[in-house]
């Protein structure tokens, strides 16, 4: 298991990006959360197996139909215990 902090920039707020991310994460069994940041980016904290997180990152880089992803920054993080994947506010 590994944990990642993911920062997504572009047109990613107000276009269903967080709910898209939650759906994909739950389908893949990834734990953590997603939230909007005040600077217009989306922050994702994700815990899972490395291969599963690779699939997740591919989906995040594409985003939902109305989103335009311009950048994705990924950092390794400390593993925290989450029961599920949620949208944080």
Swiss-Prot record:
It comes from Archaeoglobus fulgidus (strain ATCC 49558 / DSM 4304 / JCM 9628 / NBRC 100126 / VC-16). The keyword DNA damage does not apply. GO terms for molecular function: acylphosphatase activity. Residues 3-89 form the Acylphosphatase-like domain. This is Acylphosphatase. Its EC number is 3.6.1.7. Belongs to the acylphosphatase family. The active site is at residues 18, 36. PANTHER family: ACYLPHOSPHATASE (PTHR47268:SF4). Signal peptide: none annotated. It is an enzyme of class 3 (hydrolase). The gene is acyP. It comes from the Archaea. It catalyses: an acyl phosphate + H2O = a carboxylate + phosphate + H(+). Keywords: Hydrolase. The keyword Hydrolase applies.
């Amino acid at each position: 298991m590994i944990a990642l902090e993911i920062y997504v920039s572009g047109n990613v707020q107000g276009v269903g990006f967080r709910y898209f991310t939650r759906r994909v994460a739950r389908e893949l069994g990834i734990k953590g959360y997603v939230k909007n940041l005040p600077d217009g980016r989306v922050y994702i904290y994700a815990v899972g197996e490395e291969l599963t997180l690779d699939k997740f990152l591919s989906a995040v880089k594409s985003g939902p139909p109305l989103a335009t992803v311009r950048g994705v920054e990924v950092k390794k993080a400390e593993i925290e215990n989450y029961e599920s994947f949620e949208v944080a506010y």
